[in-house]
Amino acid sequence: MKKAITLLFLSTLPAPVLADECALVIEGNDAMQYNLKEMSVPATCKEVTVTLNHTGKMPVTAMGHNWALSNTADYQAVATAGMSAGADNNYLPKDDPRVLAHTKMIGGGESTSVTFKTDGLAGKDLTFFCSFPGHFAMMKGSFKIG
C-alpha cells in the first residue's frame, strides 16, 4: 500500500526530471577558458540543448566564443579550416559534416544555445571546442553521450 501511495504521488509531479539532464550550460570567459572540461548526457536523451554563457566583458570581435562539437579525430582540422571561413560563418567551415553542432559566436555578457539530435553519437569520442581563431587549443573538452 505504501508503494502504491508513493507511485500515485510521484505521478502527480510536473515534467520528469530527466528532461533537465538533456540541457547543459557552459561558460566561457575573457581568459580563453570554459568552466567545464567534460560534458555528458545520458543515452536516454534524444536531443541535447547546450547553452553557452560568455561571462567576460570583451566584444565578440576581440574575444568571441562559441561552442562547437565534432568527432575528436576531426576537431583540430575543423578548427583550422574555420579560421579561413571567417566571422560570418562563426569560424567554422560552412556545411561541413564534421561539425556535428554549434552555436553562434558571442561576446561578453551574451548567451547562445544550440539543440541537436543525438542519433548515432552515443559512445563516440567527441570533443567540444571554441572555433574563434587560436582558442581551440585551450577551450576544449570531451562530450559523452551514454
Where are these regions (language model features)?
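Short amphipathic, basic-aromatic surface patches that mediate peripheral association
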Residues: 52-57
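Positively charged n-region of N-terminal signal peptides that target proteins for export
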Residues: 1-4
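N-terminal edge beta-strand
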Residues: 21-47
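Cleavable N-terminal signal peptides
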Residues: 6-7, 17
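Extracytoplasmic/periplasmic copper-protein system
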Residues: 20-29, 73-92, 133-146
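Beta-strand signatures of extracellular beta-sandwich domains
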Residues: 66-70, 129
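Extracellular/periplasmic metallocenter environments
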Residues: 101-146
